Design a protein with these regions (language model features):
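Residues at the C-termini of beta-strands that transition into short coil/loop
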Residues: 42, 63, 116-118, 147, ...
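Class I SAM-dependent methyltransferase SAM-binding "motif I" and its flanking Rossmann-like core
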Residues: 20, 91-164, 208-211
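A contiguous loop/helix-start segment that scaffolds small-molecule binding in enzyme catalytic cores
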Residues: 11-13, 69, 80-84, 140, ...
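Short phosphate-engaging motifs
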Residues: 45, 120, 176
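Class I S-adenosyl-L-methionine
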Residues: 2-115, 123, 216, 228
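Short secondary-structure boundary/capping segments
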Residues: 4-5, 29, 51, 76, ...
């Protein structure tokens, strides 16, 4: 007989990456395979992510549900003895709204586990063979969003963050691209490279490399309003700087000669 996986005694929040099932972590894949109930954000996760689910598992879409409805289902299924997983696109710690769900579940004395996932900025950068941290250019990556209906802390305005001239990954910002471009051009040269990704790693997704001065125009032409990421970085296409890591004249713990 094959090995029978032990039922989880916790609810798992699982990051499933931006869309490609091959980018699932081994742990995420294992959790999906043993789940009795899979609660997933169908507006942000392609259905093929569920291809590895076991036969007979219950799959519940959440795009039309509010917080209380989602958590009520999770509690009900878990208390009925089911193995419950909650799927989130990308990595749950980034703009995932998991805190409020977890608080409700913990109030019911339910143990929680969070499984990290690959984020869209990593995949988009990989598609363009881009390194976002280059010595003497930038060693900092900022993951943020343009202010919209959800407020931003006063000290985290895009203008304040752009002053660092580091690599900036803009999530949830396609509707505010005009204002974002205007702000970024105050601190970055117009020719700064920008990776634009739409539904990154989905079957119909794509990425493009453009210049900052064209970010608004390009977004309008492509009718981008959601599921879009912008990576603005002075490091992209900058091949003039060399890392010390593999420099023969640089000594470190594992290479002292």
């Amino acid at each position: 007989m094959g090995k029978i996986e032990k039922m989880d005694n916790k609810i798992s929040f699982i990051g499933v990456g931006p869309g490609d099932p091959e980018l699932l972590t081994l742990k995420a894949l294992k959790k999906i395979k043993i789940a009795d109930v899979i609660i997933w954000t169908d507006s942000l996760i392609p259905e093929k992510i569920l291809d590895s689910a076991k036969e007979g598992s219950e799959k519940i879409k959440t795009s039309s549900l509010n917080l209380e409805q989602i958590t009520s289902i999770m509690i009900e299924k878990f208390q009925a003895g089911k193995t419950v997983v909650r799927l989130h696109d990308g990595d749950p710690c980034l703009f995932g709204a998991i805190r409020e769900q977890i608080e409700i579940l913990k109030n019911e004395k339910i143990e929680i586990e969070v499984v990290p996932g690959v984020s869209a900025f990593q995949v988009a950068a990989a598609y363009h063979e881009a390194e976002l941290t280059i010595p003497d250019v930038t060693q900092t990556i900022i993951l943020t969003r343009a202010g919209g209906r959800t407020g931003m802390p006063e000290k985290e305005s895009l203008k304040d963050l752009a002053k660092h001239n580091s690599s900036i990954c803009l999530y949830l910002s396609a509707r505010h691209v005009k204002r974002s471009q205007e702000t970024l051009l105050e601190f970055y040269p117009p020719e700064t490279k920008v990776i634009v990704g739409f539904r990154v790693s989905w079957d119909d997704g794509w990425t493009s490399l453009i210049e900052l001065k064209d970010m608004e125009k390009f977004s309008i032409e492509k009718k981008l309003i959601r599921t879009t990421i912008y990576i603005i970085s002075p490091a992209i296409s900058n091949s003039q700087k060399r890392s010390n890591l593999y420099n023969p004249s640089y000594r470190h713990l594992f290479r002292n000669k």
